[in-house]
Amino acid sequence: MIDAISFKNGTFRYLDQRFLPLQEIHVETKNHQEAIEAIKTLAVRGAPLIGASAGYTVVLGINEYTGDKAGFPEYFKNLIAEVNASRPTAVNLFFATKKMQEVYDANFENDSLEALFAKMTDMAYKIHNDEIDNCDKIARHGVELLKQDFADVLKTRKLNVLTHCNTGTLACCGIGTALGVIRLAYQEGLIERVITSESRPLLQGLRLTAWELEHDGIPFASISDSSSAILMQRGMIDFAITGADRITANGDTANKIGTYAHAISARYHGLPFYIAAPVSTIDITMAEGSEIPIEERNPDELRKIFGTQVATPTTPVVNFAFDVTPGTLIRGIITEKGAVVGNYNEGLARVVNG
C-alpha cells in the first residue's frame, strides 16, 4: 500500500502530494512548524490523513520542548492553537488535537513530562491506526449499501461511479473512505469503471485519484469538473460517492469545492449521491452547514497552474476551498459504524454517541 505518512524515532515522514503523479518525494522532519506548513500547503491533505498528521505534529512540538514542567502548560496551549489554525475546515484535525488535549488533561498533574510525552505519542499512533481500521469498516458498510440500493441493476450489469477529489490512501491512511468503498466494490465485481473529476484548482482528482486507480489497475476515466452532468445525462454514471471534511448534525457536508455541483446534477438525473467518512468527521455541535467555516485560499491557485501564469496577477478571484452539500441531496452517509440513511439528526447522533 502507498505510504502517505509514517512516524518513527521522533521523525515524521510524509509523501509530498504536491508533486504527484510525476514525482514521488518523501520528506522527513522533526520540526512541528515544518509539519504544520505541510498541512497548510496541502503537501499532506485529506481530512483523515490531516487528523493523523496533526497528532504526530503535536508530538513533534512536545519533543521540541526544553523547559521545565511549570512552563509546559502555556507552551502546550500555544502548540495546540498553532496546529488547530493550519486547516480550519477539516474537523478531523480538531478531533486529533482534542484527543491529545484529553491525554494532557488526564495525566499532566501526576505524570512526569517524560511519561506524559510517551502517552501522547501512544495516542498519536492510535489516531493513525484507528483511521486505517475505520477505512476497512467504511468500505464494507458502503458495499453492503450499494448491493442493497442496486440489487436489481447488479443482476444484469456492473456500475459506473463518479468520485471527486481524492479519498484514497493518500487522504485517509488506509484504503480510503469513498475510494475505499470503490476499491472493495471493484474487488467484489460491482464496478465497471470509475469516473474521477479533475477537482480544480489543485487537481487532486486528476493527479491523485487517477494515480491511485492506475496503481491498483482499476478501470477509470478522468473528466473536467463541469462534465459530470453530461455523463449522467448519457447514462455513463450510476451513482456518485465522495468523502467529507466536516459533516453537521443534519447531514450537511463540507467537501472539496465542486462536490455540491455534482450532488445537484445527481439529484436532477435521479442518481444516488453518497458520502463516506469516519465518525471523527461528524461535528454534531454544528446544527447545519451554514455554521461551517469555509477556507478561502490564495487567489494564485487559480491565476497560476503549477507555476505557470494563466491570468493576469490583478485578476480578481474568489477561491473557496470547500462547498457544503445539503443533507437533503445525500442518499446515505457511510461511516465505520454503519450507513446512516434518512433522518440524519437522529442517525448521526446515534453513531457519534453510540
From Swiss-Prot:
Chain positions of site Transition state stabilizer: 165
Alphabetized InterPro entries for the sequence: IF-2B-related, IF-M1Pi, IF_2B-like_C, Initiation_fac_2B_a/b/d, M1Pi_N, NagB/RpiA_transferase-like
Pfam families recorded: IF-2B
Active site residues according to the UniProt entry: 245
Keyword terms, alphabetized: Amino-acid biosynthesis, Isomerase, Methionine biosynthesis
HAMAP family: Salvage_MtnA
Name of protein: Methylthioribose-1-phosphate isomerase
Species of the source: Chlorobaculum tepidum (strain ATCC 49652 / DSM 12025 / NBRC 103806 / TLS)
